[in-house]
């Protein structure tokens, strides 16, 4: 009887202890989620304020607002406008699938070719929610992008939090992300670009994968992470045409995890798309390790001075290394690499387990957990105190973005050019022309389409050393009515020889001579963009200047050649 009472008493005590632990865990999770959402919302508000102050967005007219969509990104916003202007969503979608009003002489499926699914979803939500009664279309579109950026930083917060066990690491990751904003995102100047829509989904996928790879999660949490991973991966593939390259790198990271037995095979086979590749890799790497004298021990523990019990950490090590290598080769990859460097660095600063492992590696005594906690808070507050004034100062001292020459050009096209006119020029400028005037163009800023790339190369011959007749034939083959020559390309100055557009054209056309290590361009014809401004024959036989300002010269391609001498 006495033993039974003692047993019941102990069970009650342990039950109370477990209940208290569970309550504390729920409280920590609640405040961590609250902090993550707060960081995301604050970042979205910051981006909105920064964007408005940089472009004076709220005080501009519609034309000047649309010109702020740079790097050819305005083309995507044009299709969003088109969907809203259509009588119905179904009709607008059908018109985009048989679009013959964008690229001259071609009928394209714009939805598939340009991955317009974000614009379709945004226009559908704008219609069904009745948002047209209280918000302008452009603000709804911009707000959707900023909302996704909030999701982006929230996912980074969660990644660092899951690995380190403290949401202080998440706050530090977000702080460093904002501080390095110029290297983490292009949302400042090219809102509609596909990567601004796609990378938040990839960030959510990485956060879900981080949780999925963790060993200390329940089966319900594991299933939630798996479903989140599947949904975000599908969306990522749908939105961005280059997403499969990123997922391939991610597959390599998982391949290495499985090859070195750092994660249960069940998880990798569930998570990885290329599970057959991973299985082959295991059969190759494992025997090689044994042949080199390595024991087949897989149950690594922190007590052994290893972090094998945290496969999510090893995954992020591989992730950071692979994307870092690509960032060294391609500058554009820094937008994929830097955010995860910020996140992983925050984890490294705030993870007590990692510090214990490092100290065991170097044969030093472990530090007290309270000391680690103090160090984390010092790092966070030092970062905030040092960089917060600079970040806030960016909102108060921004030069006004104003492009009067482009505004003048678009105004002339709207008022003077025929409705059915076809324009040729650089892809980025043509995207702006398409957005602001709706005119047909000869090419688009889409660099995965070989046909469009060939059209762009033919149009760029206006900056090469080609005859007037050659350029005329190339332009008329594209049904061009007007060609726009940009001073920034024609008179481009660069310290790197051979990297300008006109240098590349000279090399492609065989108009280059090498002499004692120096590169010289040579042709029996002068550079077209210079010669045509002289306004003499034979250039005036084929082209007639109809508009010019400091930045642009617009020439009409004569339908009837008039020979003047």
Language model region names:
Residues 1-62, 68-72, 367-375:
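Start-transfer (signal-anchor) and selected internal transmembrane alpha helices
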Residues 321-323, 327-370:
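Hydrophobic/aromatic-rich transmembrane helices and adjacent perimembrane loops
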Residues 55-203, 209, 399:
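Active-site lumenal/periplasmic loops and adjacent helix-entry segments of GT-C-fold
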Residues 274, 302-328, 341-344:
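Transmembrane alpha-helix segments characteristic
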Residues 97, 143-262, 266, 271-283, ...:
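Membrane-embedded helix bundles of polyisoprenyl
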Residues 72, 87, 361-565:
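Extracytoplasmic
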Residues 284-306:
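Membrane-proximal helix-loop-helix interfaces that form the catalytic/acceptor-binding platform
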Residues 46-53, 213, 253-256, 260, ...:
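Transmembrane-helix exit/juxtamembrane "anchor" motif
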